[in-house]
C-alpha cells in the first residue's frame, strides 16, 4: 500500500508543485497476489482537482514469470494541498478532460469526491473520539514514536508510511490468531481526520472483529498523542480483511 500511495503522491505533486497530505483512500481490493520475483507495474493519474484537494487513481499490475500480466488492484485516493504545518492551501492548477474517455474519469472522480464529503461531514467530532474501551477482547495495543524519517514534507507524517505500519500490525494480529501465513485481501475506505506530526506518539489499538472460515476482519484505531501539549487526536480507523493461506497461496 505504501507503493500505491507513493505513486499517487508523485502524480499529484507533479501537478500541484506543493506538499500533499493523504486525506483518504477508497475501498481497496487485492485481486491477485504479488509474489517474490513478480514484475509490478504501477500507473497513476490525477482525475479531478478541487479548491484545495484532488482525486488520484492508481492501477497496479503484476506479471509472474512465464505468465500474462494481470490486474492486481485499483486504488482511488484524495490528497490535500498543504503548507508545512498541515494547513490546506489552494491549488492553482486545473485539469480539463481532452476527450470522452477522460470526461468519464473526471466525472467518476468527482462523484467519489462528493460521496466522501458526505462521509466525513462529522470529521471535527470524530477527531475527538479517543475512546479505546470498545476495541474488543482479542486486542493488541502498540505505541510508536513518529520520527523525522517518517515524514517527507516538513514535520508531517507520510500517509504511505502509516499505511505500511497499519498493514504490518494487522498482519501480526491475524497471524497470532490464525497461527499461519496470511495475506491482506482488502482495506475498507479510510479517512484521515487529523494530521500526524513528528514527535507525536502513535497509539495503534488493534482488534480482531470477525472470523470466517479462512478470513478475518482486523480493525485499528489510530490516536496521535502530543506529549508536549498533552493533547490526543483520533487520526483514523482502519478495517482490513486478512486471509489465511497455505504454502501455494490458496485460502485454507
Which role fits each region the language model picked out?
Residues 1-20, 160-182:
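Active-site helix/loop of acyl-thioester processing domains in fatty-acid/polyketide metabolism
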Residues 5-6, 156-158, 168, 199, ...:
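Catalytic cores of nucleotide-enabled group-transfer and carboxylate-activating enzymes in metabolic
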Residues 8, 150-154, 170-171, 183, ...:
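Domain-wide signal for the mature, well-folded portions of proteins, strongly enriched
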Residues 21-41, 64, 71-73, 183-194, ...:
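A cross-kingdom feature marking solvent-exposed beta-strand/loop segments within repeated
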Residues 25, 141, 153, 182, ...:
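Short coil/loop residues immediately preceding or within conserved phosphate-binding loops
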Residues 35-39, 43, 47-117, 198, ...:
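HotDog/MaoC-like acyl-thioester-processing domains
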Residues 91-152:
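Non-catalytic linker/capping segments at the edges of enzyme domains
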Amino acid at each position: 500500500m505504501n507503493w500505491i500511495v507513493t505513486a499517487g503522491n508523485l502524480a499529484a505533486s507533479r501537478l500541484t508543485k506543493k506538499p500533499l497530505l493523504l486525506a483518504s483512500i477508497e475501498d481497496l481490493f487485492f485481486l491477485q497476489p504479488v509474489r517474490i520475483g513478480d514484475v509490478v507495474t504501477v500507473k497513476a493519474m490525477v482525475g479531478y482537482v478541487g479548491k484545495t484537494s484532488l482525486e488520484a487513481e492508481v492501477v497496479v499490475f503484476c506479471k509472474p514469470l512465464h505468465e500474462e500480466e494481470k490486474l492486481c488492484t485499483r486504488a482511488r485516493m484524495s490528497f490535500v494541498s498543504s503548507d508545512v504545518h498541515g494547513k490546506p492551501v489552494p491549488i492553482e492548477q486545473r485539469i480539463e478532460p481532452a476527450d470522452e474517455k477522460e470526461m468519464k474519469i473526471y466525472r467518476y472522480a468527482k462523484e467519489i469526491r462528493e460521496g466522501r464529503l458526505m462521509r466525513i461531514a462529522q470529521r471535527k467530532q470524530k477527531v475527538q473520539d479517543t475512546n479505546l474501551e470498545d476495541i474488543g477482547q482479542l486486542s493488541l495495543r502498540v505505541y510508536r514514536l513518529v520520527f523525522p524519517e517518517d515524514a517527507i514534507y516538513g514535520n508531517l507524517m507520510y500517509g504511505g508510511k502509516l499505511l505500511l505500519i497499519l498493514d504490518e500490525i494487522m498482519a501480526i494480529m491475524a497471524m497470532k490468531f490464525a497461527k499461519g501465513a496470511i495475506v491482506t485481501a482488502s482495506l475498507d475506505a479510510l479517512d484521515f481526520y487529523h494530521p500526524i506530526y513528528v514527535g507525536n506518539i502513535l497509539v495503534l489499538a488493534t482488534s480482531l472483529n470477525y472470523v470466517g472460515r479462512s478470513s478475518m476482519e482486523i480493525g485499528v484505531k489510530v490516536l496521535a498523542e502530543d506529549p508536549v501539549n498533552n493533547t490526543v487526536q483520533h487520526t483514523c480507523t482502519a478495517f482490513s480483511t486478512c486471509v489465511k493461506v497455505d504454502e501455494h497461496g490458496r485460502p485454507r
